[in-house]
Amino acid sequence: MKPFALAGLLQLTERRAEGLSRAVKLAHGVWLRARGRQVQLASLRDAHVTGLAGRLRGGVAAGQLREMNRLQRAQAAELHAAQTAIDAAHVAWQARLAEWLQVEQRLKALRLLQQRHLAQVAIQQKRIEQHQHDELVELAHRRDAGRWGR
């Protein structure tokens, strides 16, 4: 019987799908860590704002107020950078996911073709076995007919 003609391609596609699966998981982890960093920064900012509100009620010098404002701007810039990192990580994750899904569809199609090939091979094998059986029966019948005909 002929081997599955696309076996090599199927094997390569399986390896590619496995590699892409790992890449999707890695990209998702990067995205989750970026989100965690943003939550951490927002929590620090909120704690700073709460502390700042208490200090402002008691009054602060102009120099201290400038320093507090500078710190708030720095925190806002960090939060913006964190959001940018989240967005980039999300885009990368979605791109990997889309690529993996495409390869998975190709893999599914190749596996279906392989199943059809195996089914066809099984049918051919049954036909060969049936043909061989029929030949044996015919030979036995001729042999028996030759004995009785004498």
Where are the language model's segments positioned?
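Charge-rich amphipathic alpha-helical interaction elements
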Residues: 1-150
